[in-house]
């Protein structure tokens, strides 16, 4: 997947889709950039990725500050030395299929894995942004669909920002 990490100090709601030039990170795992966050809420603050917690994005604001999402959904910037959460974003292959679930928080999609014998489920790439996926085992295994990457895969993001202390900054 590609994540555009080009510096952007534009106001939330005015951010345009990053081009394929600038600082591009190509990897299967990363952080969302500000454009992807803004796309989840049409430039407002009440989209499906705003859950009242602070979390970092991949987008630099300046040479010393990075953009983050404030607990009220607004975009801010600060030194990356602060302890805001991170939301891992993973790009899954376009061939991944849904085994069961309806995409809600109470019944998230479960994806096909090594132990599944029925691989005829719905392609994940046909589902909608904001729907829930249970991916992996243990804690922190709930994700949201963010986007489909031009036929190469589906980008998902952790439903809740992760912190190494095990707690979240709420105010």
Predicted regions, residues:
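Collagenous Gly-X-Y triple-helix signature in extracellular proteins
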Residues: 1-171
């Amino acid at each position: 997947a590609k994540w555009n990490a080009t510096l952007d100090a534009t106001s939330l709601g005015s951010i345009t889709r990053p081009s394929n030039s600038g600082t591009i990170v190509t990897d299967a795992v990363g952080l969302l950039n500000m454009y992807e966050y803004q796309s989840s809420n049409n430039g407002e603050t009440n989209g499906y990725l705003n859950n009242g917690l602070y979390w970092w994005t991949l987008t630099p604001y300046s040479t010393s500050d990075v953009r983050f999402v404030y607990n009220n959904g607004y975009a801010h910037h600060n030194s990356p030395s602060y302890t805001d959460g991170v939301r891992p974003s993973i790009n899954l292959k376009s061939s991944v299929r849904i085994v069961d679930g309806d995409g809600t928080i109470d019944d998230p999609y479960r994806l096909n894995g090594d132990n599944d014998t029925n691989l005829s489920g719905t392609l994940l790439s046909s589902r909608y942004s904001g729907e829930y996926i249970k991916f992996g085992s243990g804690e922190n295994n709930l994700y949201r669909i963010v986007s489909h990457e031009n036929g190469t895969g589906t980008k998902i993001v952790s439903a809740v920002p992760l912190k190494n202390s095990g707690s979240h900054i709420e105010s």
